[in-house]
Amino acid sequence: MKPYRIKHVPTGLYYKPGEVNLTKNGKVYTTGVNAFSYFTRGYIPVSARANSKLHTSTKGVIQWEPTAYYPSRVSARIPIEQFIKEEI
């Protein structure tokens, strides 16, 4: 299998598991196990720090909501249809 990354098409950013999920580099996958295989409810949850560069630059594209337990974070549920596999 060719290496690939998961790209969020509207922002051009890549998905990476962890606390901040959208980055310029993302994670390189070499197997079939990825965000598409373990998020099966039709959306991929993402998070960021409130008022960070990521948060402020994507406000018009992603509908961010404050998190209940971490006031310094925001989160969103992005439909899987907005992501694609991009081979490297």
Could you tell me what each predicted segment is?
Residues 1-45, 50-51, 56:
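Short aromatic-glycine-(Arg/Gly/Cys) micro-motifs in beta-strand/loop hairpins
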Residues 37-88:
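Short, mixed-charge low-complexity intrinsically disordered segments
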